[in-house]
């Protein structure tokens, strides 16, 4: 089945281009941003605006509550269903997002890994709370150095999952190597936005300031009230810093600076991930929706 993928780093303009392509190709947009699946976290995840949603139908937004799990396998299954529905109605599926795990799972399938073990997860999370996240990361490094090199010490969710997988008898790296992601599940036109680094950083910095001015603090306040002040570990970038500012632990400028840095680092990881994907066409700005639509139609 054919589809269009609009990928690229955060703040590069994916949503605007996806909407423009949808209008020209008769398409509908399937979200592939892991942060936009959470209900109620709109400003801090830069979800499509009401105007953008009115301009083109969107799928796979607002799927789960904050703190709930959403992994690549579940995303791929939901995306498969949405894509099939769109195509069955004679429309063009346009996948938009920069979450590498989600994109890879959709295009090439998922690794068959052991299921979740709630008891082990609780024990590992308690260990991290007692000894610190770097200590748990060091434990992963002893078991699977390659996985530890890919995962940041503070990314508790991924460190715990990697150790959970390793407890099943094979390390994450062994499973990934065996899978190799060779299968192409879709005939996809892969477009990746590639703005110059200075331009991208300026866009990120401006977006983060707009988030703080436009409702991120209010969303963080509502989360803190809902969870009794202790925010869930699995939250998009920016909410922990916004909550820290509300508690008086960070002044506003420092909170903004930290979120800007975190988004820049995330953008870098997104680009590195996409560089590994085969068949990607990198698009430099200014983006020309008309020319790109013609390019897609000629495939």
Swiss-Prot record:
It comes from the Bacteria. Pfam families: IPPT. Substrate binds at residues 10-15. Catalyzes the transfer of a dimethylallyl group onto the adenine at position 37 in tRNAs that read codons beginning with uridine, leading to the formation of N6-(dimethylallyl)adenosine (i(6)A). One of its GO terms (biological process) is tRNA modification. Belongs to the IPP transferase family. Keywords: ATP-binding, Magnesium, Nucleotide-binding, Transferase, tRNA processing. It catalyses: adenosine(37) in tRNA + dimethylallyl diphosphate = N(6)-dimethylallyladenosine(37) in tRNA + diphosphate. This is tRNA dimethylallyltransferase. Monomer. NCBIfam families: miaA (TIGR00174). Residues 33-36 are annotated as: Interaction with substrate tRNA. PANTHER family: TRNA DIMETHYLALLYLTRANSFERASE (PTHR11088:SF60). Its EC number is 2.5.1.75. GO terms for molecular function: ATP binding; tRNA dimethylallyltransferase activity. ATP binds at residues 8-15. Transmembrane segments: none annotated. The record marks 99, 121 as: Interaction with substrate tRNA. The gene is miaA. Its cofactor is Mg(2+). Coiled coil: none annotated.
